[in-house]
């Protein structure tokens, strides 16, 4: 049986609590436990890159981690992955800060990681690469003679050609991506956007619906919407509340709660969300004194100017809205710029009447799915969800809104606050059914199954891939 080798920018710590954070770690550990194998990634520390890999083995899984120099971390991670790819892939070209040394550093680190992984690989290993930090990784492995099956999953959106082609190195990135055997995306829109970018650059031959050839390289594209652990989330959400939370719930028993939790990131649409809540207060004064909106937004990448700007903007908007609409004994908006334990958040989800999840652009947004999974099926809250979140393709029974239209969001919030119990139960049941079917284990099992079905590349095909090809004639 083939081993599974997983490569991601960071690896979860090898202890029994690693999966408690949810998300990617749960899916990866599930796949690794099933097949046995290796999880390879950055240690999270800076230091001498020439030091031997740190290896830890538990059961049939080995964790292998490495350090990065401060220069490599800054250029590969901060300056290119997060200052070029992240904003561009979230349709924010105005925030892209392209610098040629950062691009060189991005390629250099991907090559370095390929060098470090190469001695660990076995001939029949199946390799699964994750996310935008490692777009060129398969290309670097192929250059080193690796013919193993290599899959890639992009957790964030893939932009349309008008956005992607603005990147000075877009053509190189596209050709490098074709060195993967299987390219996985969150949504069909993302998959088609990638193919549109590719067909604008070179001739793409499609042998079947999702099997393609470009530059002489054969690859497959597919959609794998990432899921969650609904049973675990329901378990975390149920049970007694911590004393302070129980006291707060008692104090707010006559108040309807709108709740939202996101990383402090410009892609999440937080300023637009605050303005939509203000529109609700303005257009529906009957809710004054009877509702409260709580926004939790812990700082991420606090040293980046764009993130500092949005933090200050939110602080100002929260103060302005509370000053305009607040009353003695009633504060309409609570904004908390701090981290909360994930299990506590699931309990807060459960007693919230409305979950407000309105990113401007998001690959999936697991918060939306977690909110649904945390609800009491007999008395569930209502999910208000952005049409630009990948989750909107699955959670069609949510109240789907355009986050740029504050009036539309306000109308949806009013509808959510006044929705009948019967409708709430019906909508929740439909969404929960989808979430249970497409859980995190289903996601990883589908990807790994498809990757296993691909015939490994041969040395001869690697040589054929080096034959010159020409761009599509326009």
From Swiss-Prot:
Signal peptide, first to last residue: none
Binding site for UDP-alpha-D-glucose: 22-23, 263, 268, 340, 366-370
Annotated site residue numbers, Involved in alpha anomer selectivity: 86, 156
Catalytic activity: D-glucose 6-phosphate + UDP-alpha-D-glucose = alpha,alpha-trehalose 6-phosphate + UDP + H(+)
CDD domains, alphabetized: GT20_TPS
SUPFAM superfamilies given in the database record: UDP-Glycosyltransferase/glycogen phosphorylase (SSF53756)
E.C. number(s) listed in UniProt: 2.4.1.15
Keywords noted in UniProt: Glycosyltransferase, Transferase
Major enzyme class: transferase
Keyword presence, Translocase: no
Pathway stated in the Swiss-Prot or TrEMBL entry: Glycan biosynthesis; trehalose biosynthesis
Pfam family, one: Glyco_transf_20
Any one Gene Ontology molecular-function term assigned to this protein's record: alpha,alpha-trehalose-phosphate synthase (UDP-forming) activity
Source superkingdom: Bacteria
Function: Probably involved in the osmoprotection via the biosynthesis of trehalose. Catalyzes the transfer of glucose from UDP-alpha-D-glucose (UDP-Glc) to D-glucose 6-phosphate (Glc-6-P) to form trehalose-6-phosphate. Acts with retention of the anomeric configuration of the UDP-sugar donor.
Similarity comment: family membership: Belongs to the glycosyltransferase 20 family.
The name this protein goes by in its record: Trehalose-6-phosphate synthase
